[in-house]
């Protein structure tokens, strides 16, 4: 059999030839199934302190990927690995006969093997499976790379290779999904129900962001990938579900950098008859539970710009946005004129949203630039200017502000929460104001969602809501400064992914 080797795939010609020769002899190098009695993890649990050199467990069948091959005359050794664990195999001529030499003709690093044999310890005290039979389960056509020489771009583009040969990448994923599981368990314990909302939506909303657009051929309509989970979760609240949450993907057609990926994972929850104070307490309790469960400590280590910080989750600071900016500037922000704020914006190279110098939005921009990097320890920043969101309830005692908080850790926004706006008349007015902002050049202005206002018009109880960026939380728990390290398949140029 003759194959034209696709250079883009980088198949090894010798390996392809082995596959062809095996197939010509009726041997399938990619069989349908292999029965194992023990995983490598199971075998590692059978370790004994007395380390007998005679076999102590018999007819063990397992499988793994070949890490290295060490041929030594009539006795050779091979390491295989699976699920992050390694196992040494011992091959003997007197056990395998003619299949001993054949092994080295057809097996290479990277191949997946099924093996059967007896468990013992070598003279050096290493747990070893002395094999009596082996089966090639998947012939690798590409030589495994030298992981130490791989660029970050290669690792992100070919994540399957990264997971195989980079223990840290594998550990990051284990922490990621353990964290998500723990969040679910915590919310279940508090009586929340997990629900689903549409990913494709006729009107995007719930955040200030640019959407991805698609076209529904059957309807001949443009729809959007969701930028938030908020508006449909609130419809659940209107419908009588009092405690709901969703953990899902959202999509924002914006920047790609160390803390942003256009496709990311968000937790949102909504709690009827609660306000942002209740949500603040819930957030603190949940994060303390997650950090302690995942890290076995209330403290984590996190590096920023080469400096390592100890972040303590046992206590959370609280400060208003105005007070935090006043602290940094050394000047009372409430007493600053709009012209002073505009001058400060210009001095810091900040552009206003939609080219409009609106006081509340200038305060938010200055906060993001000047205060956010200083918030290393967990800090709830409270009471934002009313102009910053059209979906939050006005503050009950502070005119011009809304009952909103964001949680900052390690100089990053981690969570956003409101006492949710449930007055349909005010919601209608704010959506219309957003439309005026859009007409004046603000591309991130919130669109008018008629059905959402209609839902509020049926009556939504007082509600507290929360959003947490799961990816940034995982960055903290794994001490990673780049979001690409903790997203399994981060967004890259298609050219980078398709080309080696």
Curated annotation (Swiss-Prot):
PROSITE patterns associated with the record: AA_TRNA_LIGASE_II
GO BP terms: lysyl-tRNA aminoacylation
Keywords: Aminoacyl-tRNA synthetase, ATP-binding, Cytoplasm, Ligase, Magnesium, Metal-binding, Nucleotide-binding, Protein biosynthesis
Residues the record lists as binding Mg(2+) 2: 413
GO MF term set: ATP binding; lysine-tRNA ligase activity; magnesium ion binding; tRNA binding
UniProt cofactor(s): Mg(2+)
Protein name: Lysine--tRNA ligase
Origin species: Sulfolobus acidocaldarius (strain ATCC 33909 / DSM 639 / JCM 8929 / NBRC 15157 / NCIMB 11770)
